[in-house]
C-alpha cells in the first residue's frame, strides 16, 4: 500500500488486548489460569522467566511514536487504557500497534495490528478491535487489540501559519508548565558586550535596541542575593571571573566565581549547586578532544565549605531494561544551565525580595567568555590568557599560542511568575538527587520573598508572556505522577513505566507550525527526523533520531511553495561539533547532519519541481557557520612553544583562521516568538529521557507580526545578531522571508567563505557569517564543494563519515 503523509496530530488510545498467546514460552498457548499459575511459581522460586510484562507501542511505519506502561501478571488480557497526543510528520501506509513482552535485555514480539492511514484522513474517530498478526501478517490465534484513533490534519489547525495571532494566545498545549503573563525577559548575545558594539536598530515606539551583558548581570545577581543562590550546570568552573572588561570595572569584580560563591554562603545565603557527574561517556569521547567538565575539581573545591555542591549523575528512571539503564547513566548528561537568586525589588527602598532566574546555553565555566568580536589571537595576553580554550587540537595550549576557539552563545534572564517555574524545576531536581533537604522554605518567608506575581503591568508595551519547557524524566525530577492518566493531565508523556517531560520538542513543533514568514535558528547541532533519511549505507529505523524538527521545517517550506508564498529558514551551526574534527565521533555527527540536510533539501526540490518553479533550494533553506580570520598585529602575544609540524594546529595558526564555535540553542519565528534554552537540535536534547534540558518560549503581546512586521525586542535581538555575524545592517534584513534578503545574506556569506578559505590574507575578515561549505543540487542532493572535501587546515571531511563502532544513540 502506498505511503501517505500524516502531518498533524494523532490522538490515540490503546484500551486492551484479548486472547494473547506467547510463542516464546512452552505454556504460551495454555489457558489463562495455567499460565498465571506457572508464572507465579517461577516468580516465587526465582526460576524461569517469571511474570510476563506486556506493553504495546504505536508506530508510524518504523518510527515509534508512543508506548504504554508494562502490565504484569496479565498474559492473556492486559488492560492499559492509555491515551497519546502524537505530533506526526511521517510518510506511512499504516498505523501499527505492536504488542511485546519485556525482557531484562530487549523485548520479545507477540504480534502487530495494522490500521490503514487512508482510513484516518477524513478526521473521524475510529474505535475498533484489530486482529493481531505475526511477522508474516498471519493471525496469531484469536488475539486482538482494542484501539481508538482520530487524526487532525495540520492544515485544519486554527493556528497553522497564523503566528501568535493575538495577546490571548494561550501558549503551547499539553505541557507541564503553563504560560505566564506579566513577565520581563532580557536577551543576551554572548557572555559580554563591550561598549563599542553599538548596532543602530530601530524598534517600535521610537525606541532603539540596547544590548545587555550576561555575565555582568549574573555577577550582580549573585553578589546581591540575600537568601538563596541555586545553580545547575553541565559544567561549573570555580576559577573563572565573570567581570573582565577593563572599561567596565565593578567593585569586587576580580573575584573568582568559586570565591564569590563561598563568600555568599559564609554570609548566610543558601548556595546549592547541581553539577553533572561526568562518569563515563567521557571515556569513549575524551580521546576525541572533548573538554573536561571539572566536576571533580569543583566538588573538591567546595568540600568542607558552606557551599553545597552535589555531583549529579544522569540516573535512569526505575523502569528501563538493564541495557537502557546502562545507556542513560553512561551516555547522557544533565545539560540544564540555570541560576536562580532572590533579588531586590525594582523600587530600591523595599525590604521585600523577588525571584530572578537565568537560563540559556552558557555554562559558568572556562572557554565561555567572549564578545561579538570573537578574536582568535588578540586577547591571548589579556582576558583569554588564563582562559585559553582549544579542544579541537591535540595539545592545544596557551604556551603554543592561538588560534583559541571563540565561543558564540545566547542566554536570558527571566523575571516575574516565569522565574518561579525555573525555581520549581530546581527544587524538583534537588529533591530527587540533591540528598539533604537544604532548600530554602520560601513559605516561611512570606513577608520577605513575595509570591509569584507580575513584574509588568498588562498595559505596559514591554511586557512579555513566557512559558517554560523541559526535557527531563522521573529519574531526574521529584514528584512526577505515577500513572499515565495523571501524567497526561500534567502535560507529561508516559511510556513503559517512564514519565517524561518532552515539552521542548513540543514547543519547537508548535512554533514551526505557527510560523508565517521566516525562521532563524542558531544551534550547536542540527540532526534528526531520521525516519525520513535516505537508506544509503544505513537502516534509518536503527538510528533512532526520531524528533520532528527538521521534517517540520521542510514541510513548512513545502506548504508555502504549494501556496505560492515566500518562506525562508536560516540555520547557523558550528563548522563541526567541538572536538578533533577527524575523530570518529565528530565525523559521525557530520554524517547525520548531512543526511538531515539532504532529506530537507530533497523535500524542497521535489516541491519546486511539482509546482513548476525554477529556483535554488537555498533560496528557501540555507545553512551557515561562523569563522574568523585575523592579520597579525604588532605587539601581539608571542607563544613560547610551537605546535607540532604538519598538524591542524600549526596549519590554522599559520593561516590565522578558525571557526567560531556556535553553542547557541535558539529559534526566532517571524521576529515575534523566541525559544532560548540548553537544548540542541538532536535526539539527546529533544528525547526527554536522554539529556536533561530546560528552555523558554516567549513573545511580547504588543509586538506581534499580525498586520505589520513585529518590531519589539525579539526583532532587535535578531538584527543585533545579524550585525554581529555580517558586520553590517541592510534595510533588506528587515524582511528575512524575501528572496532579496536571503540572496543578499547568501551572497555575503559566500564572499566571506571565499575570504576565509583563501590562501591569501590581506585584511581581517569583515564579518563572521560563512556559507556552510556544501553544494546543493537541483534534486536536493548535498555534495562537496569543488576542491573542498575537507575543512580548511584539516583532513576532516565536511560531509562526515559513518562510524562503524560508535552506536548511533551516542552521536545522535
Curated annotation (Swiss-Prot):
Documented EC number(s): 3.1.4.4
GO cellular component: plasma membrane
Co-factor requirement: Ca(2+)
Protein's recorded name: Phospholipase D alpha 1
Subunit structure: Monomer.
Domain PLD phosphodiesterase: 330-368, 658-685
Taxonomic classification: Eukaryota, Viridiplantae, Streptophyta, Embryophyta, Tracheophyta
Domain of life of the native organism: Eukaryota
Binding, a 1,2-diacyl-sn-glycero-3-phosphate: 335, 524, 663
Top EC class, one word: hydrolase
Record SMART domains: C2, PLDc
UniProt family annotation: Belongs to the phospholipase D family. C2-PLD subfamily.
Native organism: Zea mays (Maize)
